[in-house]
From Swiss-Prot:
Probable substrate-specific adapter of an E3 ubiquitin-protein ligase complex which mediates the ubiquitination and subsequent proteasomal degradation of target proteins. The keyword Repeat applies. The keyword Cytoplasm does not apply. Residues 45-112 form the BTB domain. This is Kelch-like protein 36. Residues 147-249 form the BACK domain. Kelch repeats lie at residues 294-343, 344-395, 396-442, 444-491, 492-544, 545-593. SUPFAM superfamilies: Kelch motif, POZ domain. It comes from the Eukaryota. It comes from Rattus norvegicus. Pathway: Protein modification; protein ubiquitination. GO terms for molecular function: cullin family protein binding. Interacts with CUL3.
Amino acid sequence: MEASKQMRVSRPYKISESSKVYHWPGHSTTVLQRLNEQRLHGLFCDVVLVVEEQQVPAHRNLLAVCSDYFNSMFTLGMREAFQKEVELVGTSYVGLKAVVDFLYSSELELDGSNIDYILETAHLLQIWTVVDFCCEYLEQEVSEDNYLYLQELASIYSLKRLDAFIDSFVLNHFSTLSFTPDFLQTVSVQKLCIYLSSGQVQHTWEYDLLQAALQWLTQQPEREVHTCRVLENIRFPLFPEDILLQRVKLAMCSLLPSEANGEGFVEEAMHYHNSLVAQPVLQTKRTLLRSEECLLFVGGEVSERCLELSDDTCYLDTKNEQWVKETSLPARRSHHCVAVLGGFIFVAGGSFSRDNGGNAASNLLYRYDPRRKQWIKVASMNQRRVDFYLASIEDMLVAVGGRNENGALSSVETYSPKTNSWTYVAGLPRFTYGHAGTIYKDFVYISGGHDYQIGPYRKNLLCYDHRTDVWEERRPMTTARGWHSMCSLGDSIYSIGGSDDHMESMERFDVLGVEAYSPQCNQWTRVAPLLQANSESGVAVWQGRIYILGGYSWESTAFSRAVQVYDREANRWSRGPDLPNAIAGVSACVCALNPRLEEKKKKNKDKRQDRGQ
């Protein structure tokens, strides 16, 4: 003690009392390396693991830290906690040594000769990092020759990650695998139903899936009891009527016994086809297309005089970042409205000439079925409408306001596919056109617009409850606007861009501002402004982002072909793939489309090439 006092040096001045923390980056690595050196030299090891009459020395502390199995063994009063040697059952020396080596070195070498042993041991000892490494290794090894074995392995060890990967593999190769003897003999009814019910299953057309189902059912007599369970995953309404009666029904009758009751699915599909107009409200899981939703634009007024109004309906091909024509409208339209109900695209009203002041307003309603790529004309609206809003809510459409040859409208009417008719409901409190609207939790919201009176556009926000047939005022926007866009994303309603008139000069100017409304708080908040003007543009929410398509600038009197994309998380606008033409008065929507046969074949070929097969 005296010596230590003599070693101290007196301070000529005071040292700061502030503290600083120092970090040794390689500390944990060094500790692990030293522990491994001790283990290899037999130093301080306090337990010996015994398996297959071979010994693996280790440190209890490290085993307990890395393994829930050993932690329970050494801390819950089991007899192994006091034994020098602990014998393990249900594992192998190869697996145990590799896993213990990993705990000390953080390195794991996997190959075809040891993967089974290591996975078995890691699962027993509950060392989930090693289990994940094994899954990652096996995922790279999945092939048409071993996927069934690996699927069984995933089932034995409850490896959800590997099981999901193999399911994805089967879905991507279903047209090849589903007719192989191994698949037909081995795949369980549970797995078959998962594959047949998926929207991602590889197939050229629905008949391929029906054949796979019938082949599986007829492999073994005892599978007859699963007929309804399997066939309920085949989307019979997607077959045309002639195919249903001539091929589908014939195939089922020839392969299945009459008591299997397979014909009920054909009858259900025929009822669907015979109820043509009501199909949007007859949707079940069997009427849905097996495809992802696409972003589309419909019609509009193009800037090139020679083109005038457009009849294009195009979707965005994300792989090639270009717009591809899906179909042509039955009639050219601009400043119309589009809504999707039951997977059908409805196009209502709009102008049939470049003079869209209301004199050329239409009351026609067309419906597009992406399943059959077919347009039909259904019941017309009671009033001609242009510059209005069309909502899809529950099992009906709602047309709100607008204008026609008689001026601005306050009327609101609903369309029922069940009756193929329009019915007036509670009207707006005032004449309104050039407004925007959206749906939020089964309520219709509209904002802004004009009423032909002299003065600027409105700030008001209205909410319609179709259950009570009542319109109510909500907190107005911070910015007056018309010809703008509205949409719902997450828990907010967005009011986007548009234009307004100066109070003094009545000159039109562009509004680039964007604001978000919270229905819960009844409050507006400004968010990032648009990159450029967007009056009379199309709007849709797709894959968690807002898309603004085309539009018009009143200040530069120019049409736009720009696509503006809003990322809510980043609160930022960016540019998407340009439209084929500069266009305004366009509508947009999101809907699942039925790829053409040649597109499906190309997609299946691309999948095989991507996997090097």
